[in-house]
């Protein structure tokens, strides 16, 4: 039985961890995940999906704010793991830790060397890519730059957003890891170096990127909305108040960027730099997420054709 230390945080990671837990060839000695966070206005403490799964299986849990130089680092190095598996962990691993195990493998949600970094799924959708994927790679000190063990891809559909693609890639990543790990560990599967000259990066989404730019084409704005749903969520402004936009559809029509060009009891169409978008699901400031029909029956009632949002 191969003894593993697992590191990860979101549901993507938990899906991969569950695959390892269900496989008798592996024993998870401990998991390392991000600290619990206070969420929302009520500051409700929320544990990570990886921590929740570890609690259900009675696995030791380590949650350092920063792994390097921590007491937790000393403790996990004493567990005697054969190797490390990471998936969307969110921290760099100290070299001393990488050197303490026989192997260290990362499950990364992109087709490397494209989209190294923390938000590959967001950028794949926002950039209008036709496919996304997962790369199983060896871990080195440089971010997502290790040799590649295996790759798998899937089409990005017009109906996909970050949430749906996250779920698809988690399953692909789980299966790809379980399929490739035995051959990798036996030496049968030889890792392939990345072409570093082709590397692109996907840094974590900044608050500035969440704001919609109505001068872009309707396809670009549409991709941007999908690439921010369900988190961190794209937004525009209506009378100085933030209006989050979760879903929209491509539409025809012309007008000034951000201008209301169609308003009925059931639809609100906004012009972009080229074409238009029909808003479907929005969230006004201080309100719950709602359909455009509910919005037009409430706060959006005062909007008129010709008005411009986003200012």
From Swiss-Prot:
Residues annotated to bind (6S)-5,6,7,8-tetrahydrofolate: 110-113
Pfam families named in the record: Formyl_trans_C, Formyl_trans_N
Keywords for this protein: Protein biosynthesis, Transferase
Record SUPFAM superfamilies: FMT C-terminal domain-like, Formyltransferase
Protein biosynthesis keyword on record: yes
InterPro entries: Fmt, Formyl_trans_C, Formyl_trans_C_sf, Formyl_transf_N, Formyl_transf_N_sf, Formyl_transferase-like_C_sf, GART_AS, Met-tRNA-FMT_C
Entry's EC annotation: 2.1.2.9
Protein role: Attaches a formyl group to the free amino group of methionyl-tRNA(fMet). The formyl group appears to play a dual role in the initiator identity of N-formylmethionyl-tRNA by promoting its recognition by IF2 and preventing the misappropriation of this tRNA by the elongation apparatus.
Family (UniProt): Belongs to the Fmt family.
HAMAP family for this protein: Formyl_trans
Name this protein carries in UniProt: Methionyl-tRNA formyltransferase
Species the sequence originates in: Streptococcus pyogenes serotype M2 (strain MGAS10270)
Lineage of the organism: Bacteria, Bacillati, Bacillota, Bacilli, Lactobacillales
